[in-house]
């Protein structure tokens, strides 16, 4: 069927900021879809609030609106643009929920706008728990015994009838938000109450728990002619009961018989046909390990996290083809872009095993609740490909960047058997490592299967890995044992550890016996047809399918899995760098391990290696490809940390040289450079042990800011006020980076700002200065940033620009550089310099129109700023005001304190732009879901050192109609100063404490600060948690509250008696 001619203009709804449950996979899907629609000649309008994406680049759509994804703003854009149709299925849950809201508000009918891909009825049937249940019954598809509830009492009655455990699934939420497994009435009441609150339709499904069944997923496609196929089937290592986003997943399925596979495949195709979905769909099923009994768990009527994984696992571009199906094309008339000869109707066949392991944020949140359940907690994921399961699993383990090179954590060797068994039964994010430790201690896989319900097949693979370890221990320097270990995915580092040698010895031994990996192509057809894709994975076999081309090549290292501190911003820079390399006439090669991102789309680069970002794996690619050089600037700390070892091995690092990277990272060298350049910095010293740190703090004077060197995202950074706190910090935080010393700095409580600069070594372009709303002490990634600066004098801006130029030239920076400053009493101090792309590059590129990563790459390849037509110095400022605001995922992370400090906690960002600061702030707050009522009750609970400042805010809140409430100490201070506040009770005072008031809807906002030391007391954390759980705006920095107040004041009329 030919594409539709009756529509010309299509609006695509993006997925908004990155949060847990909705990450970079939607940037990948949205980018693919927009380009596919443009390719077919449609005019594409994109709406998204996230500036950190490739999707929001000008060339991706005809018109791009970076605006809040709220009904108010999307409605305005629709009325302005008048699209013929909207494609909502590529924006995750956000896109689907927005489509439903537009329909319910009558906007789609009013303007005669059609929904493409998935009809409203299908979204409703898949997402509304009652309608889904009815549909499954009509199709004769089994679902667990369940009921729909709208109150907690209804849930309790049903559970009493069918017995515990039960699962709670809120309707229309993402990543299992608000859901969970309940083993008791108390748990059921708590989880259902929260789930009803988080469901936009106040509805939860309560169902009989089938925890322990195998969890299987089918990624299916269907077109308007009712052609349907299975793109990929996947099997979770963990049984039902753990969210699939938090499970280790293998593709294709590993333990199903042919009969089971056909049975579940038929069910999946029956469901997509019944829903009449045109595009991609994900079906999750539970299979009884001991019979042919199965249940349908849920259906996602859209492109999802699993679609991105299935696309990368098979090479089949689901989002691209789904977009074309949405405009009428059919599977039997579209060519599969991988083979270039077969049609998209051919089901992909895999002659390899793919492993996905989630990446969790618990290295950042040590006190977070790590136990896994039906609510997702992972921030990102890694994928690895191998010829056997062991190989793909071990490659994925070393891709995680959590300090392991194998499925082994050495720290676990010290724990008791009792603790080990507990951790094996109660699944946490690191259960794989506990299982492997149990096998090393001699627990049988049958025992472990009965404790965990993990299939014996998977446990046997873990046992096989342990057997190879034992074989290596018994046969040191034995070539056949080495060959076997490499065939099953063991790293040189692990083998060296077992043989008590250096990694370089193993590498030398391999090379002396010509034992090197070959690279196989991902071709969707198990080599049945010729494929043209430059998409490769390594394995230890005979035939190499990756041939070095005659063209000079450049290798760009990606940034690995998405985690807090290193998000999609770095992937954005990687993709732009590749474009510039190709324009310069080189072959661009990407190496990365993240299946969610645009950089691992095989059509982006000339060659893609889906490999772990370790020294060994990178060197193997370099040995084969012999690139002209390697670019490490765009891969965040992941790539920077590899620069030294690659350089030592004789690899050419392009751009800023390793010794200059070191001068920015090494404290003593950096101090020396600043002295030579005449640039002030807060007084500071380096310490390698407790005594030195205490001596440094005594000399500098408390409070001090302490942190390890060579870290990203403020990892283990803290402000300490006295000796005891400093001792405690040294005992707990040095783990963060043991081979590097601790930095002890004078803490300056001033205004912070940051600069991204691009240098060719002689000239320096500064696209803009970003002013932070929150003062020093809040991590830059968690601060709201304003461009152009609103409160910095011309002189201060000139000083910042001058210091930046001196630094870039003095540190021999070629390419990107990020500098952070603090300003106090009109004095500018440098806090830190990062000689690489930073997380603000996409934001600043969008608001200034300067393609920063592309320019930096051209300079790295030898051009000058003058060649490219750019002047030296600060670029002319934008006429609009732009705000970058952080977005947090605290609702998904129980027991993680939402108090902001020097360690980064945000998972994503949004942008607000307008003609004034107030309007831009309003948009930013709307986009990051901080909706504040125009009046109501606001609670102040304030530390002594900021009560005076809070008082003036409270007076302003009162002037616009807010009722002021306060805790005892704060209320007393306010009263002394002539402002009366309603007293709220102490925690535990059931009728009147803050959590109770919040729960009953009597509080519209909370302002809570904890003083310079930032040690969170238990009461404070309970107050903050109650605000997060109930969705009440919470301000832990007075500057953020002040910004919100500015917005409210600008929206209020002045009402005064004459």
Curated annotation (Swiss-Prot):
Binding positions (Mn(2+) 3): 820, 832
Pathway linked to the protein: Amino-acid biosynthesis; L-arginine biosynthesis; carbamoyl phosphate from bicarbonate: step 1/1; Pyrimidine metabolism; UMP biosynthesis via de novo pathway; (S)-dihydroorotate from bicarbonate: step 1/3
Residues reported to bind Mg(2+) 2: 298, 300
Sequence positions that bind Mn(2+) 1: 284, 298
Domain ATP-grasp: 133-327, 671-861
Domain of life of the source: Bacteria
Start and end residues of each stretch annotated as Carboxyphosphate synthetic domain: 1-401
Cofactor: Mg(2+); Mn(2+)
CC annotations in GO: cytoplasm
SMART domains: CPSase_L_D3, GARS_A, MGS
Keywords: Amino-acid biosynthesis, Arginine biosynthesis, ATP-binding, Ligase, Magnesium, Manganese, Metal-binding, Nucleotide-binding, Pyrimidine biosynthesis, Repeat
Residues at which Mn(2+) 2 binds: 298, 300
Record text on cofactor binding: Binds 4 Mg(2+) or Mn(2+) ions per subunit.
Record: residues binding Mg(2+) 3: 820, 832
Domain MGS-like residues, every copy: 930-1058
Stretches assigned to coiled coil: none
Binding annotation for ATP 2: 707, 746, 748, 752, 777-780, 820, 832
Gene3D superfamilies for this protein: 3.40.50.20, ATP-grasp fold, A domain (3.30.1490.20), ATP-grasp fold, B domain (3.30.470.20), Carbamoyl-phosphate synthetase, large subunit oligomerisation domain (1.10.1030.10), Methylglyoxal synthase-like domain (3.40.50.1380)
Recorded GO MF terms: ATP binding; carbamoyl-phosphate synthase (ammonia) activity; carbamoyl-phosphate synthase (glutamine-hydrolyzing) activity; metal ion binding
Catalytic activity line of the entry: hydrogencarbonate + L-glutamine + 2 ATP + H2O = carbamoyl phosphate + L-glutamate + 2 ADP + phosphate + 2 H(+)
Function as written in the Swiss-Prot or TrEMBL entry: Large subunit of the glutamine-dependent carbamoyl phosphate synthetase (CPSase). CPSase catalyzes the formation of carbamoyl phosphate from the ammonia moiety of glutamine, carbonate, and phosphate donated by ATP, constituting the first step of 2 biosynthetic pathways, one leading to arginine and/or urea and the other to pyrimidine nucleotides.
Assembly mode: Composed of two chains; the small (or glutamine) chain promotes the hydrolysis of glutamine to ammonia, which is used by the large (or ammonia) chain to synthesize carbamoyl phosphate. Tetramer of heterodimers (alpha,beta)4.
Comment block on domains: The large subunit is composed of 2 ATP-grasp domains that are involved in binding the 2 ATP molecules needed for carbamoyl phosphate synthesis. The N-terminal ATP-grasp domain (referred to as the carboxyphosphate synthetic component) catalyzes the ATP-dependent phosphorylation of hydrogencarbonate to carboxyphosphate and the subsequent nucleophilic attack by ammonia to form a carbamate intermediate.
Family under the similarity heading: Belongs to the CarB family.
Protein name listed in UniProt: Carbamoyl phosphate synthase large chain
Species of origin: Streptococcus pyogenes serotype M18 (strain MGAS8232)
Biological classification of the source: Bacteria, Bacillati, Bacillota, Bacilli, Lactobacillales
Gene: carB
């Amino acid at each position: 069927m030919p594409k539709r001619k009756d529509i010309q203009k299509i609006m695509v709804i993006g997925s908004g900021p990155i949060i847990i449950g909705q990450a970079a996979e939607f940037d990948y899907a949205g980018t693919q879809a927009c380009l596919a629609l443009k390719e077919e000649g449609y005019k594409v309008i994109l709406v998204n609030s996230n500036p950190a994406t490739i999707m929001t680049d000008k060339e991706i759509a005809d018109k791009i609106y970076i605006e809040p994804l709220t009904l108010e703003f999307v409605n305005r854009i629709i009325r302005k643009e008048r699209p013929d149709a909207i494609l909502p299925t590529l924006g995750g849950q956000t896109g689907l929920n927005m489509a439903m809201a537009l329909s319910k508000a009558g906007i789609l009918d009013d303007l005669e706008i059609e929904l493409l891909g998935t009809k409203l009825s299908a979204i409703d049937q898949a997402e509304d728990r009652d309608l889904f249940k009815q549909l499954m019954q009509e199709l004769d598809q089994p679902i667990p015994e369940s009921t729909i509830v709208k109150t907690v009492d209804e849930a309790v009655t049903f559970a009493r009838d069918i017995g515990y455990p039960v699962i709670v699934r809120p309707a229309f939420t993402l990543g299992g938000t608000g859901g969970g497994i309940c083993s008791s009435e108390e748990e059921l009441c708590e989880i259902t109450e929260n789930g009803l609150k988080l469901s936009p339709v106040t509805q939860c499904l309560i169902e009989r728990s089938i925890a322990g069944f195998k969890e299987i997923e089918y990624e299916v496609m269907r077109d308007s002619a009712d052609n349907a196929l299975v793109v990929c089937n996947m099997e979770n290592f963990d049984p039902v009961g753990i969210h699939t986003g938090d499970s280790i997943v293998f593709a294709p399925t590993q333990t199903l018989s042919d009969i089971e596979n056909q049975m579940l495949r038929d069910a999946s195709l029956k469901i997509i046909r019944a829903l009449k979905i045109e595009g991609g769909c994900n079906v999750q099923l539970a299979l009884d390990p001991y019979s042919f009994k199965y249940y349908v768990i849920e259906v996602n009527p859209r492109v999802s996290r699993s679609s991105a994984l299935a696309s990368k696992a098979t090479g089949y571009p689901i989002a691209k083809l789904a977009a074309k199906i949405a405009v009428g094309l059919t599977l039997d008339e579209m060519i599969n872009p991988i083979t270039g000869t077969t049609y998209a109707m051919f089901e992909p066949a895999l002659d390899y095993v793919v492993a996905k392991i989630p990446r969790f944020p618990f290295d950042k949140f040590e006190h977070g609740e790590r136990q896994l359940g039906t609510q997702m907690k992972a921030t990102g994921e890694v994928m690895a490909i191998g010829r056997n399961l062991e190989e793909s699993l071990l490659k994925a383990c070393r891709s995680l960047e959590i300090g392991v090179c194998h499925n082994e954590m050495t720290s676990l060797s010290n724990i008791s058997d009792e603790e080990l068994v507990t951790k094996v039964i109660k699944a946490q994010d690191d259960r794989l490592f506990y299982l492997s430790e149990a096998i090393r201690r001699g627990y049988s896989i049958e025992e472990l299967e009965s404790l965990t319900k993990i299939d014996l097949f998977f446990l046997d693979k873990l046992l096989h890995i342990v057997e190879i370890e034992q074989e290596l221990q018994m046969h040191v320097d034995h070539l056949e044992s080495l060959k076997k270990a490499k065939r099953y995915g063991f790293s040189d580092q692990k083998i060296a550890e077992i043989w008590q040698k250096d990694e370089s010895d193993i590498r030398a031994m391999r090379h002396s016996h010509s034992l090197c990996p070959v690279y196989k192509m991902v071709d969707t057809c198990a080599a049945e047809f010729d494929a043209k894709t430059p998409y490769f994975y390594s394995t230890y076999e005979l035939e190499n399918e990756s041939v070095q081309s005659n063209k000079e090549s450049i290798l760009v290292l990606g940034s690995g899995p998405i985690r807090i501190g290193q998000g999609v911003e770095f992937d954005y820079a990687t993709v732009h760098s590749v474009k510039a390399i190709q324009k310069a006439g080189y072959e661009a090669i990407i190496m990365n391990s993240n299946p969610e991102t645009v950089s691992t789309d095989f059509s982006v680069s000339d060659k893609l290696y889906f490999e772990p970002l370790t020294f060994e794996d990178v060197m193997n690619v370099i040995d084969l490809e012999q690139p002209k050089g390697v670019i490490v600037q765009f891969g965040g700390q992941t790539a920077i940390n590899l620069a030294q070892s690659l350089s030592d091995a004789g690899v050419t690092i392009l751009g800023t040289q390793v010794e200059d990277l070191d001068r920015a990272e090494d404290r003593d060298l950096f101090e020396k450079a600043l002295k030579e350049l005449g640039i002030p910095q807060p007084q500071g010293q380096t310490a390698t042990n407790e005594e030195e740190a205490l001596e440094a703090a005594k000399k500098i004077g408390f409070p001090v800011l302490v942190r390890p060197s060579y870290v990203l995202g403020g990892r283990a950074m803290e402000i300490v006020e006295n000796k005891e706190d400093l001792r405690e910090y040294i005992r707990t935080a040095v783990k963060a980076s043991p081979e590097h010393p601790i930095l002890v700095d004078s803490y300056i409580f001033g205004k912070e700002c940051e600069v991204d600069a691009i240098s060719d070594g002689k000239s320096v372009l500064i696209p803009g200065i970003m002013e932070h709303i929150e003062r020093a002490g809040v991590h830059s990634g968690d601060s709201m940033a304003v461009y152009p600066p609103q409160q910095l004098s011309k002189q201060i801006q000139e000083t910042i620009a001058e210091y930046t130029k001196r630094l870039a030239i003095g540190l021999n920076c070629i390419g990107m550089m990020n500098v952070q400053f603090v300003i106090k009493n009109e004095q500018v101090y440098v806090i830190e310099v990062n000689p690489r792309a930073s997380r603000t590059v996409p934001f600043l590129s969008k608001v200034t129109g300067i393609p920063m990563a592309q320019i930096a790459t051209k300079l790295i390849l030898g051009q000058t700023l003058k060649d490219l037509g750019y002047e030296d110095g600060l670029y002319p400022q934008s006429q609009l005001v732009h705000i970058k605001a952080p977005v947090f995922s605290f609702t998904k992370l129980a027991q993680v304190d939402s108090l902001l400090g020097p360690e980064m906690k945000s998972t994503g960002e949004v942008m607000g732009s307008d003609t004034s600061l107030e309007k831009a702030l309003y948009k930013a707050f709307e986009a990051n879901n901080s909706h504040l009522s125009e009046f109501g009750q606001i609670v102040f609970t304030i530390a002594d050192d900021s009560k005076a400042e809070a008082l003036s805010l409270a007076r302003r809140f009162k002037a616009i109609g807010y009722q002021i409430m306060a805790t005892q100490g704060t209320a007393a201070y306010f009263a002394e100063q002539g402002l009366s506040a309603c007293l709220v009770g102490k925690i535990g005072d059931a009728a009147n404490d803050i959590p109770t008031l919040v729960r009953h809807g009597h509080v519209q906002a909370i302002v809570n600060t904890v003083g310079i030391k930032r040690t969170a007391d238990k009461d404070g954390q309970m107050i903050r948690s109650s605000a997060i759980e109930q969705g009440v705006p919470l301000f832990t920095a007075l500057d953020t509250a002040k910004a919100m107040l500015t917005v409210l004041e600008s929206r209020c009329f002045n009402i005064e008696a004459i």
